[in-house]
Amino acid sequence: MIYPFFCASLPTLLPGVPPELSVEDFDASAREYLSAADFAALISIDSKNPAEYSVEIYRKLREFQDYLKWKIALLRSERLKRSDRFTPPDEFFGEVDFAIPVLAAAEPVEREKLLDALIFQKLDELEIFHEMDLTALCIYRLKLGILQKYAKWNEINGKNNFEAALEKLAADFNEL
């Protein structure tokens, strides 16, 4: 089913720009416009069990994320000279292989930002040919979640929390 009025009312999402609405606000609006079955499919991504995903786009995104994690684990095990065995995922995403060495070497926060940028880019690709349908709304919700995560981040508070944690660790270490 298509939802032209609902889709047209949604603000545009751009990478790096805080969203104008939250996932919760989007879900509240979606509940009004979508059928009960489509709304259940839309929020099926919230399930921790991929078998419960009702929309194909969620399964495709999960395969993409699994591939990224597999490549990072493989590269890190090679770098650490470990003999871990990793089973490759079914799908191959060669378009991101150039970024894997950067991801494997990055600090955790930077790695997460880079992964989210790759996921956002993949969502843009998956959005092609899906305008105003349930898949487009699912992609919109995923992008909104990524952008909302970074809108809540505060570098100053994060830095202060990090420094406080380091001071506590240093104090605990000095007590030993």
Predicted regions and their residues:
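Extended alpha-helical surfaces
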Residues: M1-L176
